[in-house]
From Swiss-Prot:
It catalyses: L-aspartate 4-semialdehyde + pyruvate = (2S,4S)-4-hydroxy-2,3,4,5-tetrahydrodipicolinate + H2O + H(+). It is found in: Cytoplasm. This is 4-hydroxy-tetrahydrodipicolinate synthase. Homotetramer; dimer of dimers. InterPro entries: Aldolase_TIM, DapA, DapA-like, Schiff_base-form_aldolases_AS, Schiff_base-form_aldolases_CS. Pathway: Amino-acid biosynthesis; L-lysine biosynthesis via DAP pathway; (S)-tetrahydrodipicolinate from L-aspartate: step 3/4. Belongs to the DapA family. GO terms for biological process: diaminopimelate biosynthetic process; lysine biosynthetic process via diaminopimelate.
Length: 293
């Protein structure tokens, strides 16, 4: 299942005065992303501040993105949690909205399941879901790593179509690509590893940087796929300072800062995250401005 090459892990626009998910700002952001290189969107993922969104806010967010998108980009809804039964129930509810192409299911966090528990969790969600499932492996946040052998087993299930790999382990990612079918999609979960993962056979990126350099991310991937490896590598090197700068403080505060500076109003982050201070903002803006020199 082709979900796109540059899939943006979309921030959630918040009204700065009312502290509510803002439909007008969602509409503006979705159009901006699609016009600037995104062929897919992840909604209510980590970058979308899912831990601080209520159930009703997520549903409101999904509905507005579906309406604005109008079938243009692939939509992947973040419906995972560390509670299998709750994940299944929420995934079913989201499927009934229509207009969602797949769900992103994060590895259960905090309760630290072993590999058998991880397999059983994803298998149960897959069996119950009418929507295709993308596994999200992010051991830096979930504490547990979904081992390659577990992902390879899960890839054999008919409704599990891909993985967002944020482990940063190219050996493991290479093994997954080598031992799964060609239609199993392997996405980099780190902007800075997009090109290396493409080089070992990956399919694209679920990106944060694409909020501000989406066209450049597309250009890099397309250059690589045309065999213009040196051009792709040059773009990668040029974008690398920004990719790293967007994680200089906890995500998505830097991304929201740059979008707001560019006139794409997405509001603040929610506590316990905090917005950039003046010094942090100045440094980040300088990195972005340096790309055009």
């Amino acid at each position: 299942m082709d979900l796109g090459k540059v899939i943006t892990a979309m921030v959630t626009p918040i009204h700065p005065e009312k502290d509510k998910v803002c439909k007008k700002r969602i509409h503006h952001l979705v159009n901006h992303l699609i016009k600037n290189g995104s062929d897919g969107l992840v909604i209510a993922g980590t970058t979308g501040e899912s831990p601080t969104l209520s159930h009703d806010e997520k549903i409101k967010l999904f509905r507005q993105v579906i309406e604005t998108n109008d079938g243009r980009a692939k939509l992947i809804a973040g419906t995972g949690s560390n509670n299998t039964a709750e994940t299944i129930a929420f995934t079913k509810e989201v499927a009934e909205l229509g207009g969602i192409d797949a769900v992103l299911i994060v590895a259960p966090y905090y309760n630290k399941p072993n590999q058998d528990g991880l397999y059983a969790h994803f298998a149960a969600v897959s069996e119950a879901s009418d929507l295709p499932v993308v596994i999200y492996n992010i051991p830096g946040r979930s504490v547990v790593n979904i081992e390659p052998e577990t992902i390879i087993r899960l890839a054999k299930l008919p409704n599990i179509v891909g993985v967002k790999e944020s482990s940063g382990n190219l050996d493991n990612i290479s093994k997954i690509i080598a031992e799964t079918s060609d239609d199993f999609q392997v996405y980099s979960g780190d902007d800075s590893l997009t090109l290396p993962i493409l080089a070992v056979g990956g399919n694209g990126v679920i990106s944060v940087a694409s909020h501000v350099v989406g066209n450049e991310m597309q250009e890099m991937i397309q250059a690589f796929e045309r065999g213009e490896v040196q051009k792709a590598a040059q773009i990668h090197r040029e974008l690398l300072p920004l990719m790293n700068g967007l994680f200089s403080v906890p995500n998505p505060a830097p991304t929201k800062y740059l979008l707001n500076q560019q006139g794409i109003s997405v509001g603040p982050v929610r506590l316990p995250l905090v917005d950039l201070n003046a010094e942090q903002g100045t440094k980040l803006q300088a990195i972005l401005e340096g790309l055009s020199k």
